[in-house]
Amino acid sequence: MTAILEKTEVQSLWARFAAWIVSTENRLYIGWFGVLMIPCLLTATSVFIIAFVAAPPVDIDGIREPVSGSLLYGNNIISGAVVPTSNAIGLHFYPIWEAATVDEWLYNGGPYQLVVCHFFIGICCYMGREWELSYRLGMRPWIAVAYSAPVAAATAVFIIYPIGQGSFSDGMPLGISGTFNFMIVFQAEHNILMHPFHMLGVAGVFGGSLFSAMHGSLVTSSLIRETTEAVSTNAGYRFGQEEETYNILAAHGYFGRLIFQYASFNNSRSLHFFLAIWPVVGIWFTALGLSTMAFNLNGLNFNQSIVDSQGRVVNTWADIINRANLGMEVMHERNAHNFPLDLASVEAPSING
């Protein structure tokens, strides 16, 4: 009798670590993108919470008039925010070691840049992690492609827009009222509501919500019953079953009769592709619009009113929007400049006589 002895190969610590990182058997997949994502998102989240609760006021406009954003300095959940980095810093990289003291770093809004940069790296890695897990499982990569839409939108407001405007102080504040303030100022300075790409984004978000609600309600209403009337329909479902759980033809027939035949899908793949692509493309366009307006390539500006043959102004909706934009711009950074930039850009009259 011959005994066959096999030499057991001892794996190195690194090999075992690498196998654990890319294992799809873990409860939560880590992946190589996760190695960078986890510390970045933990850092961003921790600093955001601390700054939201306790950060001192920030000199956002760079004019020695600090703005309070934290809860301990008089704000509530609605008005609180992590205030953007000071205009005095501009686009300079501003880690803690660039400031003379921690107090100076806080005064100039260093936490905002720290949170935004780590958050940006984190969400990009999350998108890469989605692709990585799909690749390991032999799936197609479209989950990561869909997630690229919100990543593009976040990149536009936190990275591209400050770069285009020349300062991180123009980035979106990290808070509820700060977000609304950013939107109002953006409208005042760029007339975003009159930009076709923003209109496509609105159609994508609201249309996606409508289509999602329609699809969910149709599926829920056409479940295949495997039980009696006395028992819940859900009791007939087995997790992971191969059989269809709802009748797409019944849903197609219902919706076709409700509107018209070709308004509904009878192909499940086409239906779900449409549900995915509609909001994603809309948000892509919005991010593209934000990124172009960052460099002052603005929306459709109707700066000249329509006049009749007698020179009288024919009031239009564009006049109302223009007036609202000027009013919002007057109130924005009211201590930093006295007039809206649209009015202040006109050459001053000579005073030399």
Swiss-Prot record:
Localization: Plastid, Chloroplast thylakoid membrane
Residues holding [CaMn4O5] cluster: 170, 189, 332-333, 342, 344
Prosegment location in residue numbers: 345-353
Binding sites annotated in the UniProt record for Fe cation: 215, 272
PTM statement from Swiss-Prot or TrEMBL: Tyr-161 forms a radical intermediate that is referred to as redox-active TyrZ, YZ or Y-Z.
GO cellular component, one term: photosystem II
Keyword Plastid: yes
EC number(s) per entry: 1.10.3.9
SUPFAM superfamilies assigned to the protein according to its UniProt record, in alphabetical order: Bacterial photosystem II reaction centre, L and M subunits (SSF81483)
Residues bound to chlorophyll a PD1: 198
Residue numbers of Phosphothreonine PTMs: 2
Residues spanning the membrane: 29-46, 118-133, 142-156, 197-218, 274-288
PROSITE patterns linked to this entry: REACTION_CENTER
Keywords recorded for this protein, A-Z: Acetylation, Calcium, Chlorophyll, Chloroplast, Chromophore, Electron transport, Herbicide resistance, Iron, Magnesium, Manganese, Membrane, Metal-binding, Oxidoreductase, Phosphoprotein, Photosynthesis, Photosystem II, Plastid, Thylakoid, Transmembrane, Transmembrane helix, Transport
Subunit description: PSII is composed of 1 copy each of membrane proteins PsbA, PsbB, PsbC, PsbD, PsbE, PsbF, PsbH, PsbI, PsbJ, PsbK, PsbL, PsbM, PsbT, PsbX, PsbY, PsbZ, Psb30/Ycf12, at least 3 peripheral proteins of the oxygen-evolving complex and a large number of cofactors. It forms dimeric complexes.
HAMAP family (alphabetical): PSII_PsbA_D1 (MF_01379)
Anything else known: 2 of the reaction center chlorophylls (ChlD1 and ChlD2) are entirely coordinated by water.
The name this protein goes by in its record: Photosystem II protein D1
Origin species: Stigeoclonium helveticum
The encoding gene: psbA
